[in-house]
Amino acid sequence: MGTNVEPDAALMLRVKRGDVRAFEELVEKYKQPVINVIARILRDQTEAEDLAQNVFVQVFKSADRYKATAKFSTWLFTIARNLCLNEIRRRSRHPAESLDSSQSDQEGLPARQFEDVKTFSPSDNALHGELEEKVQLALSELPENQRTALLLCRQDELSYEDISEVLGCSLSATKSLIHRARETLRDKLKPYLRTGAWKNNQD
């Protein structure tokens, strides 16, 4: 098995044997990507940081059940997604507790998350801030499964095949979710894309 095991899976197998240093390496590598995914699913940066800790606690506790047949990052983001869904369900049962976190406080969703978003010059800072706000709003209005699929797609570690495993749906369904999410965002963000519409709106 050894030569076919990816480096992250090899680290996790060491964790399975009680190697704390290997666990620390995985946390160091994946902590920020996990926080980013959770923050954009829940739209709450502070809660994302707390929930990310729970993700890695779960990883450590589940080490005995880990098998190197699946890509480590797929397994990791599946845990993160499940905890996010649990939190979303909790919020739906206790909506009053979630009012303060309904507006994202994360420090800006980078415009590079979407290839078509226009790049602004330094003099356009105010407009760029408005763009980030519009992107956040458009993301928040996507159905949960589309938003999750799209955000997972933006993580370099996850392919369509990986995402389909995380979401528990077919490859074609995954591609459809991501396609519909992108189409919805393009439609809502048309004034801010590289079509010249932004400038037209400012005239």
Question: Model segments located where?
Answer:
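Arg/Lys-rich amphipathic alpha helix in sigma70-family domain 2
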Residues: D64-A68, T78-L99, P191
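Amphipathic, Lys/Arg- and hydrophobic-enriched alpha-helical face
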Residues: V27-Q45, S62, L139, K188-P191
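Short, charged helix-capping/linker segments at alpha-helix termini
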Residues: M1-T3, K16-E25, I35-N54, L171, ...
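Amphipathic alpha-helical segment used for protein-protein interaction
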Residues: L13, R17, S92, S102-G108, ...
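C-terminal edge and immediately downstream basic/flexible tail or linker adjoining helix-turn-helix-like DNA-binding
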Residues: G2-N4, A96-D100, E107, R112-Q113, ...
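Sigma70-family region 2
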Residues: K16-R17, R43-D44, F56-K71, R90-R91
